[in-house]
Amino acid sequence: MKLSKYIDHTLLKPQATEKDILKLIEEAKTYDFASVCVNPSWVKLAYENLKDTDVKVCTVVGFPLGATSIASKVYETKVAIEDGADEIDMVIAVGQLKSGNDEYVKEEIKKIVEASRDKLVKVIIETCLLTEEEKVKACTLSKEAGADYVKTSTGFSTGGAKPEDIKLMRETVGKDMGVKASGGIHTREEMEVMIENGATRIGASCGVELVK
């Protein structure tokens, strides 16, 4: 697979304007990235501009805290798909996981997988807030709930992707799931290290620099 197809070209800053999003979309077309990842209010715009290409539209759910209710996340997912999203990056309820409420976390992922139908679901576990044991548990619950990917980070918390976390996540989910490294990846060398450790998707706001 060529390097560009690893990349979710991402712009999730709250102050991003329509002009910024359109620039992101054009870059994704030019460099043939896997997707653009945008906030839900920009999904329709992205869909309209990418529907005749093979660049997917990715959006976020329960972002960035993961602390909204399951019902809210399910509704967000359904609306995003109606608006044209191909991929859903959802944030788990980190506090529920850390409280040992495994069934809650598994249920919310399962409900979003069900709501997404045939669309791709990536589960953001926010590795920087978890212990090693919690990282393994989050990955295991994601797999049991039927998600397609596990993802390291929102990029809005205390840290981003680390190679050792990618390795642990890959070892936990096996070969059947995707692993997305996101947050703090700024160079091609950093991206290649993530891929070597098991990442099959890279979330980055500097996608153009990574493939130039």
Curated annotation (Swiss-Prot):
The lineage of its organism: Bacteria, Bacillati, Bacillota, Clostridia, Eubacteriales. HAMAP family: DeoC_type1. It catalyses: 2-deoxy-D-ribose 5-phosphate = D-glyceraldehyde 3-phosphate + acetaldehyde. The keyword Lyase applies. Pfam families: DeoC. SUPFAM superfamilies: Aldolase. Belongs to the DeoC/FbaB aldolase family. DeoC type 1 subfamily. Pathway: Carbohydrate degradation; 2-deoxy-D-ribose 1-phosphate degradation; D-glyceraldehyde 3-phosphate and acetaldehyde from 2-deoxy-alpha-D-ribose 1-phosphate: step 2/2. InterPro entries: Aldolase_TIM, DeoC, DeoC/FbaB/LacD_aldolase, DeoC_typeI. It is found in: Cytoplasm. GO terms for molecular function: deoxyribose-phosphate aldolase activity. It is an enzyme of class 4 (lyase). It comes from the Bacteria. Catalyzes a reversible aldol reaction between acetaldehyde and D-glyceraldehyde 3-phosphate to generate 2-deoxy-D-ribose 5-phosphate. GO terms for biological process: 2-deoxyribose 1-phosphate catabolic process; carbohydrate catabolic process; deoxyribonucleotide catabolic process. GO terms for cellular component: cytoplasm. This is Deoxyribose-phosphate aldolase. The active site is at residues 89, 151, 180. Its EC number is 4.1.2.4. The keyword Lyase applies. SMART domains: DeoC. It comes from Clostridium botulinum (strain 657 / Type Ba4).
